[in-house]
UniProtKB/Swiss-Prot annotation:
It is found in: Virion membrane; Host membrane. Its main location: virion. It comes from Phocine distemper virus. Residues 56-607 are virion surface. It is a single-pass type II membrane protein. One of its GO terms (biological process) is virion attachment to host cell. Belongs to the paramyxoviruses hemagglutinin-neuraminidase family. Non-sialidase subfamily. Keywords: Glycoprotein, Hemagglutinin, Host membrane, Host-virus interaction, Membrane, Signal-anchor, Transmembrane, Transmembrane helix, Viral attachment to host cell, Viral envelope protein, Virion, Virus entry into host cell. This is Hemagglutinin glycoprotein. GO terms for cellular component: host cell membrane; membrane; viral envelope; virion membrane. One of its GO terms (molecular function) is host cell surface receptor binding.
Length: 607
């Protein structure tokens, strides 16, 4: 029998089979061809793993960084929250408790104590006296044990309300017209043309009072917020028929209304004639808030109330309402009250205004407390350089070396208080002209324009700012300069070196217009032309321009008074002018009162 091995050998012997050595070579070649591809795949996988690890590391770093920043902000917020909690707990909570105690417990107790105090004082001081309270609810429901003067107060209150209602409808259009700019706009590139006209007063109480044997000595006019007021001294020889005395003082008030198209009409609504009173020779005037106020005196120099009754000078106070209510019109003599350092005040033709129920005027005053500063100002300015004023030996209006200060007169028009004139003084630029100091309402709430007119053609006048409040301050504005030689707050008016101009016989007062921008007007009586003329000068300091217009006169003479008061109407300049002169031909005195209008236009406007 064959063994199993022999059978296998016999099988392979008789059958073909692959050579084992040749098969091994083929397998090695296949493995050699696969090795590079396998390595490439492994390399790619390795690179991918590295990239994934890198990205994972970067993201992990960003997350860690963000967590750190968030933790930092969270810690800061916790600190701030802790601080706020501390403030609320340790500061605000006790404060609220204190406020609650004050408001809830102590304040009602204090108010009750004050109420009891007022009631006790009211009952103690003349409980039967008639009180004149200024609020309407006192008329309707007066308190117990207090007697209210219904007849006086309620009539005044009702009349004022009715007057204000009627006047506002009339004056609204006037006030709108009175703020317009009179000059061409800034875009004007051509020549500015001016045209003037003269108009007689359509209706004038003064002209109706002046008869042939009568003469107006002086006239003072004030215009404010559509209201005008006038006062003048009328001298007449016709004492038997019309008046008891040769001299009478006339006051009139009214509003400016439209008449004949575009012409303003001075419509008189109330007037008063005072005769047989020597204290009305010199008067001031102020208008505003539907009223006229005036201070009248016999002499220009007034000695305020200094305690000596023999040296006191009383001032006649005249008040007129717009529509002539008897209880609003007042006539009373008052003694001015001033600080003991104020020695004298000088009252002439002064124009003021009424604001917040207070009439205010500016006058020269002689104050002992201000003399030192003014003398030092002038002395220091005259040490090294000779100004024209350094040669003066006497100063207006008090004479000698006594330099005047700026005085302010205030008169309260509140009917709940007695009439009183308070005098206060302030230091300002040196005053060369002691006549005609005026006060105009300014665009600022706490100040007005204080003007002093020019004089003799060499002093240009000056315009200052003067405060309205309790503290009286005068600040230089224009037409003044500060000398280099002076180290203190020293200002002098501009004074020319030239000799007095003989062609200018008289200068008027300085008028500040009620426009939004600062503009002012002055007039002169000029004889340089073949015909005499009143020449108007209109200034606009903001634009550094000025305009001149002469109004030729039909007569020739020597003037002694020239007074103007200007306002804006429909964008044009209107002025009420009054002048008195002595005719050369007949040597008689003549007075003229009329209106002038100056219109400014531009030849070419830029688009």
């Amino acid at each position: 029998m064959f063994s199993h091995q022999d059978k296998v050998g016999a099988f392979y012997k008789n059958n073909a089979r692959a050579n084992s050595s040749k098969l091994s070579l083929v397998t090695d070649e296949v493995e050699e061809r696969r090795s590079p591809w396998f390595l490439s795949i492994l390399l790619i996988l390795l690179v991918g793993i590295l990239i994934l690890l890198t990205i994972t590391g970067i993201r992990f770093h960003q997350v860690v960084k963000s967590n750190l920043e968030f933790n930092k902000l969270l810690i800061e917020d916790m600190e701030k929250t802790e601080a706020v909690h501390h403030q609320v707990k340790d500061v605000l909570t006790p404060l609220f408790k204190i406020i609650g105690d004050e408001v809830g417990l102590r304040l009602p107790q204090k108010l009750n104590e004050i109420k009891q105090f007022i009631v006790q004082k009211t009952n103690f001081f003349n409980p039967n006296r008639e009180f004149d309270f200024r609020e309407l609810h006192w008329c309707i429901n007066p308190p117990s044990k207090v007697k209210v003067n219904f007849t006086q107060y309620c009539e005044i209150t009702e009349f004022k309300e009715a007057t204000r209602s009627v006047a506002n409808s009339i004056l609204l259009l006037t006030l709108y017209r009175g703020r317009d700019d009179i000059f061409p706009p800034y875009k004007c590139r051509g020549a500015t043309t001016s045209m003037g006209n003269v108009f007689p007063l359509a209706v004038s109480l003064s002209m109706s009072l002046i008869s042939k044997p009568s003469e107006v000595i002086n006239m003072l006019t004030a215009i404010s917020e559509g209201i005008y007021g006038k006062t003048y001294l009328l001298v007449t020889d016709d004492t038997e028929e019309n008046f008891e005395t040769p001299e009478i003082r006339v006051f009139e008030i009214g509003f400016i209304n439209r008449w004949l198209g575009d012409m303003p009409l001075f419509q008189t609504t109330n007037y008063r004639i005072i005769s047989n009173n020597s204290n009305t020779k010199i008067c001031t005037i102020a208008v505003g808030e539907l009223a006229l106020a005036s201070l009248c005196t016999k002499e220009s120099t007034i000695l305020p109330n200094l305690g000596d009754e023999e040296s006191q000078n009383s001032v006649l106070v005249v008040i007129l309402g717009l529509f002539g209510a008897t209880h609003m019109d007042q006539l009373e003599e008052v003694i001015p009250v001033a600080h003991p350092s104020i020695e004298k005040i000088h009252i002439t033709n002064h124009r003021g205004f009424i604001k917040d129920s207070v009439a205010t005027w500016m006058v020269p005053a002689l104050a002992l407390s201000e003399q030192g500063e003014q003398i030092n100002c002038l002395s220091s300015a005259c040490k090294r350089r000779t100004y024209p004023m350094c040669n003066q030996t006497s100063w207006e209006p008090f004479g000698d070396k006594r330099l005047p200060s700026y005085g302010r007169l205030t008169l309260s028009l509140d009917v709940s208080t007695d009439l009183s004139i308070n005098v206060s003084v302030a230091q300002g630029p040196i005053i060369f002209n002691g006549d005609g100091m005026d006060y105009y309402e300014g665009t600022l709430l706490n100040s007005g324009w204080l003007t002093i007119p020019p004089k003799n053609g060499t002093i240009l006048g000056l315009i200052n700012q003067a405060s309205k409040g309790d503290q009286f301050i005068v600040t230089p504005h224009i037409l003044t300069f500060a000398p280099r030689e002076s180290s203190t707050d020293c200002h002098l008016p501009i004074q020319t070196y030239q000799i007095q101009d003989d062609d200018v016989l008289l200068e008027s007062n300085l008028v500040v217009l009620p426009t939004q921008s600062f503009e002012y007007v002055v007039a002169t009586y000029d004889v340089s032309r073949s015909d005499h003329a009143i020449v108007y000068y209109v200034y606009d300091p903001a634009r550094t321009v000025s305009y001149t217009y002469p109004f030729r006169l039909r007569t020739k003479g020597r003037p002694d008074i020239l007074r103007i008061e200007c306002f804006v109407w429909d964008g044009h300049l209107w002025c009420h002018q009054f002048y008195r002169f002595q005719l050369d031909a007949t040597n008689s005195t003549s007075v003229v009162e009329n209106l002038i209008r100056i219109r400014f236009s531009c030849d070419r406007l830029d688009p």
